[in-house]
Structures are given as structure tokens and as C-alpha cells.
């Protein structure tokens, strides 16, 4: 009986000792955790590494957020039934998406500015990276949202039989020019290559498409069926070439109609303004990108109408206008995506650099 009692007591003693050891180990671990990467009390009860891990996750979210937003915003494709103001709404919506990406970046900075660490080197570095990125996104947003009123209730490139061409609103034409130029210039500052206009003339080989420029007559019709020629000019260049030709214009080109024969130096903005003498527009030396850019602007900007002839030429003319606008939209979308990608990658790099573990004494 005594042996059994003694054995039970020994087992209890061993159990008690094991519990004491476990408790001591647990207390030691808690002490180590509390001291890891600085006092937990200074970071709202979380260790600094936990805070930084959260910041890192937010940076990843910021990097992918814009691309995740793209599918339901980018990719607008104009048809013969699309109204000009719908394209304006698209630009405004895209600006709003940039605003959301900027808001998410702001959350990254706020999460790094925890109590006791707001003025610390890590939070300061992250705040600087975020503010730099937000400045660029804000600039793009302003340019895009300024295009909200680019159009009216007319259909893109709308044309009727024997329709006289009408120059677009001078103010809106200038506004579109400044916004597109602002987007391209901002992209260039972020390492995105500027689009190039190319040297293709309206006469390509034996195909003389110069009469296609007559759709840009103002206060006059095209004089003959030239929709197919206009379509050929638009198909000869890319959207990037059209955009390059537009932003290479001078704002003053929108002030007055073309009063002399078009040359290789005649800008897209001047072609969009057009002129009363269709023959002065239709010159072999004219650059295809400038004419196509002019067709896109005339088709899209408030008040603008393309000139057409009869026998269904109006349908071909509108088709050329729609194609030109679609090409231009794709070019603008491409530059926006590349710019945002570069901006967020740069911000993420700076944030990760700030988050990286530092050697003792650094």
C-alpha cells in the first residue's frame, strides 16, 4: 500500500515539475516576442515585423489593383451607334479607377505610420514612395477626367448623305489636345517611350489616297465619294502613330481653318480643324498619321462632323471615323497601362527596400 502511495506521489511531482518547466519556457518565449524588432507596445500591440508584413501585403494589392480593375473599364470599343459623350464617360471612369489605385497606395502609407513609428525612417521612406506615385496617378487622373466633356449626343463619326463637314468646337479640340499631350508627357517622365508618328504619306506606292483627306472639309462636302480613301489612310497607320501626330501639333493649330495647301508639316490638329477648300486638304505630301489623327478628332470631339458624298459614301465615311477613334483609344489605353505599371513597380520597390531587414547598427 505504501509503495503504491509513494509511486502516485512521485508521478504527481514529475507532472508538477513538467508544468513548471513548460510555464517557464512559455514566459521566456513571450519575453523574446515582446522584444523582437522593438517593443510591441510601440506598435499597437503588434511587432514591427508583423506591421511590415501587413504593409507588404498592401503594396502587392496596390500593384495588382489597377490591373484587376482594368477588365471592366479598359477595352471600350466604339461602334456606329456609340455616342461621343459615352467615350467622354469612359475617360472619366478610367480616371476614377486611377483614383482608387491612389487610395489603396495611401492605405499602405497609413499602415506604416503606426503609433510610435510615424516619424521613423521606414514610415518616412514609405510615405515618400507613396506620395511620389500618387502625384503621377493624380496627374493622369486629371487629364483623363478633363476629357469627360469631349463629346456631345451625336454618334461617333456620324455622317449623312451629301453631308457638309463641320469643324469641331475649338475649345473642346484644344482641350482634347492638351489632355492627350499631358498623358503622353507624364508617361515619358515615368520611362514610357513616346509614340512616333512615322513618315508614311497619304500616297503609298501607286495607291493615291490623298482624296481621303476631303472628309475633313469644313462648311463643304467631300465633292465626291471618298470614304474608301479615308478608310485606306486610317488603315495605313497605327493608333500610336495617330496619337504621336496629335500631340506633336501646336495648340494654336485649332484656331483657324487650313488656308493653304496641306504639306508634310500640316498637323493632326490642323486637319481636324479642316478647311473650306477640300482640294487644299487632299495633297500627296500630307502625312497619313496626321490625316488619320484629324479624322479621329473630328469624329470624336463635340460639334465635329465628317464630310460625305452620296451613294452610301456616308456609311463608309463613318466606318473610317469609328476605326480611327478605336485605334486612338487603344493607343491611349496602352500608354496609361504602361505608366501605371511603372509607377506601381517603382513604389513597390521603394516600399520593399524600406521593409528589408537591416543589419544591426543600421
UniProtKB/Swiss-Prot annotation:
Keywords in alphabetical order: Cell outer membrane, Lipoprotein, Membrane, Palmitate, Plasmid, Signal
Any one GO CC term of the record: cell outer membrane
Annotated protein name in UniProt: Variable large protein 25
Primary localization class, coarse: membrane
Signal peptide: 1-26
Annotated lipid attachment (N-palmitoyl cysteine): 27
Lipidation, S-diacylglycerol cysteine type: 27
Native species: Borrelia hermsii
Membrane topology: Lipid-anchor
Chain's role: The Vlp and Vsp proteins are antigenically distinct proteins, only one vlp or vsp gene is transcriptionally active at any one time. Switching between these genes is a mechanism of host immune response evasion.
Additional record remark: Genes for both Vlp and Vsp families are on (usually) unnamed linear plasmids in B.hermsii HS1.
Gene: vlp25
Family recorded in the similarity comment: Belongs to the variable large protein (Vlp) family. Alpha subfamily.
InterPro entries, per database record: Borrelia_lipo
Subcellular compartments: Cell outer membrane
